[in-house]
UniProtKB/Swiss-Prot annotation:
It comes from Pseudomonas aeruginosa (strain ATCC 15692 / DSM 22644 / CIP 104116 / JCM 14847 / LMG 12228 / 1C / PRS 101 / PAO1). This is Enoyl-[acyl-carrier-protein] reductase [NADH]. NAD(+) binds at residues 48-53, 74-75, 111-112, 139-140, 244, 273-275. The record marks E75 as: Plays an important role in discriminating NADH against NADPH. It catalyses: a 2,3-saturated acyl-[ACP] + NAD(+) = a (2E)-enoyl-[ACP] + NADH + H(+); a 2,3-saturated acyl-CoA + NAD(+) = a (2E)-enoyl-CoA + NADH + H(+). The keyword NAD applies. The gene is fabV. NCBIfam families: EnoyACPredFabV, PRK13656.1. GO terms for biological process: fatty acid biosynthetic process.
């Protein structure tokens, strides 16, 4: 079939398998051009490995370090009549290229919050890898069924303590609008922490330790975003921020548990990028469109693969990691440069419907958004028939 993009709100309901494959190949090419990651990981588990930063972490491990990788994700395959999710096609492409290189690459499709997926993962590590030396935690999910109580928690994106009004960008209508977000209730904050906080990361590491599948010197990292004051009211100081602060608490206990192995646990702070998760945050499309404009002008623009590749080389496996006073690894420093943030702030209130394309890089934002789903990727012929029914060999289905 011939597949065209169909966008509804902050999601594209169609995906293009050939475009997703080309997108993965571009990321692989970027990492390989940088050369090997010195002293990089050899056997890697990526929890949330199919899109965005998690996919970039899997690509960097495999093609920067020659690592065997096991990926965990929750994606939907395509059929002859309907495309699957982008994460499915990304993972199929990743495995194809990894196998061509002679690397081990297997994936588990299921709910990473569940005990069953943790059990399947441990079984697979024992059978195929023995032990892993890096665990990347990169889950973005709207809800979580607690594996012990069965309770279902949903995350919300709201400020804490007071309602907040701010400028936003309606990406469908391409108009600037004022948005008001009501304050989260205590229950909503607690539920968001239950979904997006550090408890599940801790459960994963506890399960892996108990099963004795973490190698000596094993590292683990979970990804976070801090941002600057423009986004603080709805992000860092909001319900999502409460979950991210929980990561900062939980990492301390995880680090202590890995100490006997000579291991380490760190939260890694990455820059704002276009992902399916970030496009759902009301102010992010406008912020990102301005950020892209400013950072491209300054020659410092980066996407997921540039960020994660740099994180591995500089901090996770670098001689002098970039640490902040909280002990987090920082890869977001270019975004937070005062000259970047002050310019974004200066332009923030000047953007109108008329000058949207002139003052911001909304065109670049839209293009990167479509790239997520396999569209507008260079070198892909979108008039060609493609088969949406793509298999992932040796997939372990939970």
């Amino acid at each position: 079939m011939i597949i065209k993009p169909r966008v509804r709100g902050f999601i594209c309901v169609t995906t293009h398998p050939a475009g997703c494959e080309a997108n993965v190949k571009q990321q692989i090419d970027y990492v390989e051009a940088k050369g090997p990651v010195v002293n990089g990981p050899k056997k890697v588990l990526v929890i949330g490995s199919s899109t965005g930063y998690g996919l970039a972490a899997r690509i960097t491990a495999a093609f920067g370090s020659g690592a065997d990788t096991l990926g965990v994700f929750f994606e939907r395959p395509g059929s002859e009549s309907k495309p699957g999710t982008a994460g499915w096609y990304n993972s199929a492409a990743f495995e194809k290229f990894a196998h061509e290189k002679g690397l081990y690459a297997r994936s588990i499709n299921g709910d990473a919050f569940s005990d069953e997926v943790k059990r399947l993962t441990i079984e697979t590590i024992k059978r195929d890898l023995g032990k892993v030396d890096l665990v990347v935690y990169s889950l973005a999910a709207p809800r979580r069924t607690h594996p012990k109580s069965g309770e279902v928690f949903s995350s919300t994106l709201k400020p804490i303590g007071k309602s907040v009004s701010f400028r936003g960008l309606d990406t469908d209508k391409e108009v600037i609008k004022d948005v008001v977000l009501e304050a989260a209730s205590d229950q909503e904050v607690a539920d968001t922490v239950a979904v997006m906080g550090g408890e599940d990361w801790q459960m994963w590491i506890d399960a892996l330790l108990e099963a004795d599948v973490l190698a000596d010197g094993a590292k683990t990292t979970a990804f976070t975003y801090l941002g600057e004051k423009i986004t603080h009211d709805i992000y860092w100081n909001g319900s999502i921020g409460a979950a991210k602060k929980d990561l900062d608490q939980k990492v301390l206990g995880i680090r202590d548990k890995l100490a006997p192995l000579g291991g380490d646990a760190r939260v890694s702070v990455l820059k704002a990028v276009v992902t399916q998760a970030s496009s759902a945050i009301p102010m992010m499309p406008l912020y990102l469109s301005l950020l892209f404009k400013v950072m491209k002008e300054q020659g410092t623009h980066e996407g997921c693969i540039e960020q994660v590749d740099g994180l591995y080389r500089e901090s996770l496996y670098g001689a002098e990691p970039r640490l902040d006073e909280e002990g987090r690894l920082r890869a977001d420093y270019k975004e937070l440069q005062p000259e970047v943030q002050s310019r974004v702030e200066e332009l923030w209130d000047k953007v109108t419907n008329e000058n949207l394309y002139e003052l911001t890089d909304f065109a670049g934002y839209k293009s990167e958004f479509l790239n997520l789903f396999g569209f507008e990727v260079a070198g892909v012929d979108y008039e060609q028939d493609v088969n949406p029914d793509v298999q992932i060999a040796n997939l372990i289905q939970a």
